[in-house]
Curated annotation (Swiss-Prot):
Gene3D superfamilies: 30s Ribosomal Protein S14, Chain N (4.10.830.10). Part of the 30S ribosomal subunit. Contacts proteins S3 and S10. The keyword Ribonucleoprotein applies. One of its GO terms (cellular component) is small ribosomal subunit. It comes from Amoebophilus asiaticus (strain 5a2). This is Small ribosomal subunit protein uS14. The gene is rpsN. The keyword DNA repair does not apply. Keywords: Ribonucleoprotein, Ribosomal protein, RNA-binding, rRNA-binding. It comes from the Bacteria. Belongs to the universal ribosomal protein uS14 family. GO terms for molecular function: rRNA binding; structural constituent of ribosome.
Length: 89
């Protein structure tokens, strides 16, 4: 389980990215990299880390489901993810 402060920091970054998205796109289109450099560092989408919605784990993240591999495995075994069944051959 990730620390609450790390999760909160990532949420703050996501909010900044959303807030400055239009401005960043406009500046990039114009090629004004000096003005782009003046924006907050955390306004860049590259700084946001994909994290599990349940545990906050950063590694082993599955984009399609928004959860980590560990939570995915548990939920799949319990049948909580529709359409996912354990492979058998």
């Amino acid at each position: 389980m990730a620390k609450e402060s790390v999760k909160a920091r990532n949420l703050k970054r996501q909010a900044l990215v959303e807030r400055y998205a239009a401005k960043r796109a406009k500046l990039k289109e114009a090629g004004d990299y000096l003005a782009l450099d003046k924006l907050p560092k955390n306004a860049s989408p590259v700084r946001v880390r994909n994290r599990c919605k349940i545990t906050g784990r950063a590694r082993g993240y599955m984009r399609k489901f928004g959860i980590s591999r560990i939570v995915f495995r548990e939920w799949a075994a319990q049948g909580k993810i529709p359409g996912v069944i354990k492979a058998s051959w």
